[in-house]
């Protein structure tokens, strides 16, 4: 067997391979014999079919499989088992010239890790949200919890207000005949009138109505409520751009009866952990602060990645890009019960998501370079801390039980280690970047300006 390794691009190599028919013959004969053991041909005992007949019937397909396997083994021997080159992603067979009982000529292309020279980051600015929890934040959260615990009391005579719950039936009406359209009716729909996803036309029509009222209203031809109502409209109509006429029957109106803010309420929402109002407020403040800190870090991490990609435009091997695109397609499958949707255009999907795949591949290369240069590692103590945080100190599920669950799935354990490693990379970058802290008000104003600028650029784009 003759092999030649050549550089095809700054991040790709090609392995050219030539093998004679004599070199392939032992593997081909072995594959033919394996096929013969399972063959059941009339006139011959099972497993006793002449090898020549096996070859005549299946030789071409078997030969191709043998050739592919031979090329893969050559790649492992010539590339993977040496320290000269570190391949990235899966190799691609770009050429295979082979006929049964003839020589084999093949070319494999594979990606390699490019050199990444990290730039000086001391003058690179990023914005970090510095969230300060106010008393208003605490009171808003308490009010939210009270609303969650509230009882819904039916109103007999009072009209619906914009913070009430209304249950209705919707019957579409034919405007030409002024009669109900049979089969076009939705029943038992419940809406919270202060839900910003609710169609404004329906909200305005329902405010002021009472249980037992019936009225008509024109609504947009799409579902007249909102997509998260819990009931999808069962009928599809040809879109004509016109509103549709509905008769609305109000079944009931309910209003929230907020529980008093007392020790009993505190015990209920904390499941008995607290019973003191002041301690309850302090606990809420700490939880809000923790949640906002986490959100601030996540937003800053996104900005860090954008800055690092901008500063380090390293080339990404095609095999790495394709690997990420494969994972995107796999995610679509998992979101659809293990199958791609019937109308899924994979080629268009891959083209549309190619930039994201390339960016993820580039960030992976930059991140790995930081890990190598800084000798970042994940200790067993850090893994144990992760599981302890996941358990949250709960008695029902201990850190040890969570760890045992993860250990049954090596891929999950690998994700845990990579998550911890990524946190260390971000810590390293935050220490070296010029981080400017901003209040929530300043941060939201800046984000709004950026969104407006982005929208303006999109409008000006050809």
Swiss-Prot record:
Q: Show the domain comment.
A: Consists of 3 domains; the N-terminus binds the ribosome, the middle domain has PPIase activity, while the C-terminus has intrinsic chaperone activity on its own.
Question: What residue stretches are annotated with the PPIase FKBP-type domain?
Answer: 163-259
Low complexity bias locations: 448-462
Which SUPFAM superfamilies does UniProt cross-reference here? FKBP-like, Triger factor/SurA peptide-binding domain-like, Trigger factor ribosome-binding domain
Recorded source organism is: Salinibacter ruber (strain DSM 13855 / M31)
What reactions does this protein catalyze? [protein]-peptidylproline (omega=180) = [protein]-peptidylproline (omega=0)
The UniProt gene name for this protein comes to tig
How is this protein named in the record?
Answer: Trigger factor
GO BP terms in the entry? cell division; protein folding; protein transport
Similarity annotation: Belongs to the FKBP-type PPIase family. Tig subfamily.
Enzyme class comes to: isomerase
Region described as Disordered: spans on this chain: 439-462
This protein's GO cellular component annotations are: cytoplasm
């Amino acid at each position: 067997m003759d092999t030649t390794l050549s550089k095809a691009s700054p991040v790709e190599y090609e392995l050219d391979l030539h093998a004679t028919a004599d070199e392939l013959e032992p593997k081909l004969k072995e594959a033919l014999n394996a096929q013969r053991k399972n063959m059941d041909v009339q006139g011959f005992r099972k497993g006793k079919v002449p090898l020549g007949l096996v070859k005549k019937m299946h030789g071409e397909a078997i030969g191709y499989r043998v050739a592919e396997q031979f090329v893969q083994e050559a790649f492992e021997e010539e590339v993977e088992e040496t320290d000269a080159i570190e391949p990235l992603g899966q190799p691609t067979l770009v050429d295979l010239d082979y006929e049964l009982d003839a020589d084999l000529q093949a070319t494999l292309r594979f990606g390699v890790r490019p050199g990444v020279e990290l730039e000086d980051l001391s003058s690179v600015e990023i914005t970090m949200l510095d969230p300060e929890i106010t008393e208003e934040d605490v009171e808003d959260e308490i009010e939210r919890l009270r609303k969650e615990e509230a009882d819904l009391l039916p109103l007999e005579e009072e009209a619906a207000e914009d913070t009430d719950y209304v249950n209705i039936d919707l019957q579409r009406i034919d405007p030409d005949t002024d009669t109900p359209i049979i089969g076009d009716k939705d029943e038992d729909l419940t809406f919270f009138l202060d839900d910003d996803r609710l169609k404004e036309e329906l909200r305005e029509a329902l405010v002021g109505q009472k249980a037992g009222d019936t009225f008509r209203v024109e609504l947009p031809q799409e579902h007249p409520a909102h997509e998260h109502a819990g009931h999808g409209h069962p009928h599809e109509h040809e879109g004509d751009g016109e509103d549709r006429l509905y008769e609305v029957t109000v079944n009931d109106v309910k209003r929230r009866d907020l529980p008093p803010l007392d020790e009993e309420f505190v015990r209920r929402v904390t499941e008995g952990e607290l019973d003191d109002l002041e301690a309850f407020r302090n606990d809420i403040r700490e939880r809000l602060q923790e949640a906002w800190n986490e959100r601030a870090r996540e937003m800053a991490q996104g900005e860090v990645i954008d800055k690092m990609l901008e500063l380090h435009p390293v080339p990404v091997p095609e095999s790495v890009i394709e690997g990420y695109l494969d994972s995107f397609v796999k995610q679509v499958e998992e979101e659809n019960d293990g199958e791609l949707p019937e109308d899924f255009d994979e080629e268009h999907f891959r083209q549309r998501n190619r930039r994201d795949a390339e960016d993820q591949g580039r960030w992976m290369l930059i991140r790995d370079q930081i890990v190598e240069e800084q000798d970042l590692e994940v200790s067993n103590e850090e893994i144990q801390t992760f599981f302890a945080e996941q358990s949250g100190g709960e008695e029902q599920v201990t850190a040890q039980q969570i760890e045992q669950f993860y250990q049954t799935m090596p891929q999950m354990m690998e994700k845990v280690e990579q998550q911890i490693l990524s946190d260390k990379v971000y810590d390293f970058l935050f220490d070296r970047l010029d981080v400017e802290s901003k209040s929530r008000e300043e941060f939201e104003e800046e984000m709004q300006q950026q969104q407006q600028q982005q929208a303006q650029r999109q409008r000006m784009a050809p």
